[in-house]
């Protein structure tokens, strides 16, 4: 019984240290998303005429050495209705997003509390001629959060909240 209790404590510890939300484009397949689609507890939400695309792309390397061969294209401005990524997060966790603008200019990825509609912050997506950016923000309260472009396209490669 003691061995089982010790195993249970270790198991709980491992799961409590794992990421609450994780989405890597490397785990996806090419697709045109026109509805709410779940990937291991994280949702990509598109709509007819306001779709999100997962597509193959030239390999891009992030500053930490992670290499991506696909990208999630938000395809333009998003909202609570479409063109967003949705995930659950807990107060105090850090949301980290690997991203880049689809244009030459820096673009803004809004992080919005789904329940209140409050924008908790903006993550900068570097211009497409730069390296993939890694932007992060601390989650202020338990809840569901939306990530969407405030203006024009942004490519997303990895979303992790831990």
List the predicted regions and their residue ranges:
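Sec-dependent N-terminal signal peptides
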Residues: 4-14
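N-terminal targeting leaders for non-cytosolic proteins
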Residues: 20-78
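Short beta-strands within extracellular/lumenal beta-sheet-rich domains
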Residues: 63-90, 104-107, 131-135, 154-157
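Extended extracellular/luminal ectodomain segments enriched in beta-structured repeat modules
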Residues: 88-96, 143
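A mature extracytoplasmic/lumenal domain signature
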Residues: 99-103, 151
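Short, surface-exposed beta-strand/strand-loop-strand elements in extracellular ectodomains
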Residues: 104-119
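Extracellular carbohydrate recognition and processing domains
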Residues: 118-142
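Short beta-strand-plus-loop segments that form exposed binding edges in beta-rich domains
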Residues: 146-155
